[in-house]
Amino acid sequence: MILYGAPLSPFVRKVAAFAAEKGLELEKVAVGLGDPNPDFLACSPFRKMPGFSDGDFKISDSSAIVTYLDAKYPEPALIPADPADRARVVWFDEFADTIVTAAGGKIFFDRA
């Protein structure tokens, strides 16, 4: 399995942390948004980070990737089966991807 993206990207780091919690090894290939890497573009034609490849399966978006990994490698389960608990996990994931990342970006990157 190959994870493409910028090492400092919170979305790349989310997938890497998720895989580590599951005990999975990912090959990491560093790419930037303007990188013409054809393997990255095959996973992410719109250059959305991270890109992910597992054999012939290719996809981008950190939430889609962790959902795939949890379904393919169910133990340990990191996304609950219970509908209410699953909904809470999806909510926290979306909250982290939008609100927390936006606030964190200002803290780390908008420094004068």
Regions found by a protein language model. Name each.
Residues 1-112:
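GST-like domain detector, emphasizing the conserved glutathione-binding G-site
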